[in-house]
Design a protein with these regions (language model features):
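ATP/NTP phosphate-donor binding region
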Residues: 1-88, 330
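Fold-independent oxyanion-binding glycine-rich loops
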Residues: 9, 15-16, 38-39, 92-94, ...
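Buried hydrophobic positions in well-ordered alpha/beta secondary-structure cores of metabolic enzymes
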Residues: 14, 35-36, 70, 95, ...
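Glycine/threonine-rich beta-strand-loop-alpha-helix active-site module
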Residues: 72-79, 83-176
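Carboxylate- and glycine-rich phosphate/diphosphate-binding segment that chelates Mg2+/Mn2+
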Residues: 150-256, 357
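Short alpha-helical scaffolding segments that buttress acidic/His motifs in well-ordered protein cores
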Residues: 197-201, 242-250, 264, 284, ...
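C-terminal catalytic subdomain
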Residues: 256-308
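C-terminal charged capping/lid subdomain of soluble metabolic enzymes
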Residues: 302, 306-373
Length: 373
């Protein structure tokens, strides 16, 4: 069987890795730069401040302080910046900021004059190759967005989730310095870490998996699970481990996409506002139970998680969520059994559900939802 793997992102990971940022930007010789940030606190970082100062005459700072970016929010920042002819976007923030940054690179290439036109273009995937390069600087450890070529955009008004997705939109570079994530609240840090674990696990069993992605996935799971207790206790070294694990998980699923956990989680986040990492991790054990007959070398997967069975994994994830202060059952988030039909109908995301090794049906999706109700 042919195995192929491709990811062109230059990665710089570890404490102090931000020291390369100014040099990276300089090597690209950009005419205009957009520095997109989550909030202004990141500008206090020595190396980000140094970069902003070095290119002050060609650099504009914009703040995007929204989680799970909505279509109208993306349009607003696009409309504010579309005439600046940026040649480089530096996105500093969590997955939402990185997703908006990489989306803008594509949107700048094919101008639109209304929110509806942008929605239609993204839905039909008729956007062009990116107009500019981007550099990803994550301030959370979980999404892996800095090493993937797609971005998630939500459209709650129409109860939909879209992707801005093209192989040409990998970052020029990813700079993953755990110092930026060290001030994350524990609940957010754990949710992000569990999102990365799900990226890795789903990559491991995905139909599109390959030798390299599976190796990266196992490493990511082990690193994160070995250090998540330290994260719960606030240990500094745990943040470095989470940054490394998240990057490896991103490198794994950048080639495979995700599967049923993500597919079923989207309506849970949209309807009940369950944080993404919490929603996917709640589904991890029941989806693994469904997939078990199709997972090759599942003992390796159990070993990476530090468990011997799906039941033990379920208990472990539930305990982690509860220790972090996140409810682990749908009913605790306001879900009702009468919602199941609607949830099932919106759980079959193309490219996710059909990438799952076990076929997803209305019956088994409802069973999965009931198991975490």
């Amino acid at each position: 069987m042919l195995n192929t793997y491709y990811n062109p992102v230059r990665t710089y990971q570890g404490v102090g890795s931000l020291s390369v940022l100014t040099q990276l930007v300089s090597s690209l010789k950009p005419g205009r730069i957009l520095l997109l940030i989550w909030d202004e606190s990141v500008l206090k970082n020595r190396y980000i401040k140094e970069t902003a100062a070095a290119f002050a005459d060609i650099l504009t700072v914009k703040t995007f302080a929204w989680s799970n970016p909505e279509m109208f929010q993306l349009y607003e920042i696009y409309n504010e910046t579309k005439n600046e002819n940026y040649e480089l976007v530096i996105a500093v923030g969590g997955g939402s900021v990185l997703d908006v940054g990489k989306s803008l690179c594509c949107l700048y290439a094919k101008p639109v004059d209304s929110l509806e036109a942008m929605r239609n273009m993204i839905a039909a995937k008729t956007y062009s190759k990116p107009h500019c390069k981007w550099i990803g600087v994550p301030t959370t450890a979980g999404t892996g967005s800095e090493v993937t070529c797609w971005a998630t955009v939500w459209d709650s008004e129409h109860n939909k989730k879209y992707s801005v997705d093209t192989q040409d939109n990998y970052a020029y570079a990813a700079v993953i310095d755990p110092v930026l994530a060290s001030s994350m609240p524990v609940k957010l840090a754990v949710s992000s870490a569990l999102d990365a674990v799900c990226h890795a696990a789903e990559s491991y069993w995905a139909k599109a998996g390959n030798t390299v992605s599976r190796a990266a996935a196992l490493s990511a799971i082990k690193i994160i699970m070995d250090n998540i207790d330290g994260l719960l206790c606030g240990k500094e070294e745990a943040h470095d481990a989470m940054a490394q694990g998240s990057m490896l998980a991103g490198l794994a699923f950048s080639n495979t996409r995700t599967t049923a956990c993500h597919s079923i989680s989207y309506p849970l986040t949209m309807k009940y506002h369950i944080p993404h990492g919490v929603a996917v991790s709640m589904l991890l054990a029941p989806v693994m139970r469904l997939n078990q007959p199709y997972i090759k070398n599942r003992k390796e997967l159990f070993n990476a998680f530090g468990v011997e069975s799906v039941s033990e994994l379920s208990e472990k994830v539930t305990a982690i969520l509860e220790k972090s202060g996140s409810p682990a059952k749908l009913s605790q988030w306001g879900a009702k059994e009468s919602d199941f039909e609607e949830l099932v109908a919106h759980s079959m995301t193309k490219g996710r559900a059909d990438n799952n090794p076990a076929e997803l049906t209305a019956v088994n999706v409802e069973e999965i939802l009931r198991s975490v109700f």
